[in-house]
Amino acid sequence: MEVKDIVFMNKGDGENSYVKSAGLTLKVIAKTQPMVQKAVQSLFKGTHSAPLQVVNVADLGCALGPQPLESMSIVIESIVEKCGELGCEMPEIQFHLNDLAGNDFNTLFKGLSVVQEKYKNVSWFAMGAPGSFHGRLFPRNSMHLVHSCYSVHWLSKAPKITSEEGLPLNKGKIYMSKTSPPAVKEAYLSQFEEDFSSVLRFRSPELAPDGRMVLILNGRQSADPTEKDICYLRDLLAEALSYLVSEGLIDEEKLGSFNVPYYNPSQEEVERVIDKEGSFTTEFSDTVVLEIGGKNAWSDPGLRIKGYRCFSEPVLSHQFGEEVMDKLFDKAEEILAEDYKQGKEATKNISIVVVLKKKTNQTWT
């Protein structure tokens, strides 16, 4: 089964659903709101007539629950504010909510009533756009704004990390760690560069002239891809999985062959791919830090693990079996609680934010 068939957030609105556990992503959206507002408002020129009758907005990897609803609200309010400033007529707004086919679009669409009630006097529309952002999604020159929060760091496939003899090089781990050989780090970076370049290349023909793209990725601050704030929870999950192996609940070979299809880039790595791909000019680029330790709600081990479970469980359950998920995350919470007592836990969440403008006179093949 391909990654595109198993990467989605936990469905529904139950205890472990993404709807109930996406608090961290909402904090990221709030922190990066000014950048999104500026990108939206840059679509309007300083005239007294609206340059656009319809604004087409794509949300890549929108997921479900409060995250896409909050992003939609920010876009609507930014356009309302700019049109009020210019004294121009409000355009209609068409949202294209994109995610893989496994996404719970039913729950997503049920939540739209919140936005409908909030913006009764704004003419806006929403439609689903299932598909992979690693390929084409929309017609040429059709999108004015492409937005993505915490999606494009997902890889199209897990990097192949084996020796020439076919043996796992990252045994006992599910991501890079301090003990991983250089080949593991190189494989992850290479896969990210290939996939992120595809995201840019396929969006370029889809954006209208002077269109903007705002991408928010879960990243890292340092040049070291195994820094603690990035790898901590994945190392913790690997430890919990190893415990289940020792209990005979998981086959050791399954753990040895598993690597998460996810990469946390640095700002420099993101900018390097953008420059090399060549379709966009970078208008803004920054690293945003959120403190998640101390007295923050995320210092509660149970909440922290639920926050991780809501987006990682589908991939993990496909590899190891749905029947062990409760035991896995219970063990992870137990390890995390002990680390909290000893002050070992990671305390920061890092985001990379870029605002890109489509270059003119592009030629596509």
From Swiss-Prot:
Gene3D superfamilies: Methyltransferase, alpha-helical capping domain (1.10.1200.270), Vaccinia Virus protein VP39 (3.40.50.150). Its EC number is 2.1.1.159. InterPro entries: MeTrfase_7, MeTrfase_capping, SAM-dependent_MTases_sf. GO terms for biological process: methylation. This is Probable 7-methylxanthine methyltransferase 3. It comes from Theobroma cacao. The lineage of its organism: Eukaryota, Viridiplantae, Streptophyta, Embryophyta, Tracheophyta. It is an enzyme of class 2 (transferase). Theobromine binds at T25, Y150, H153, W154, F311.
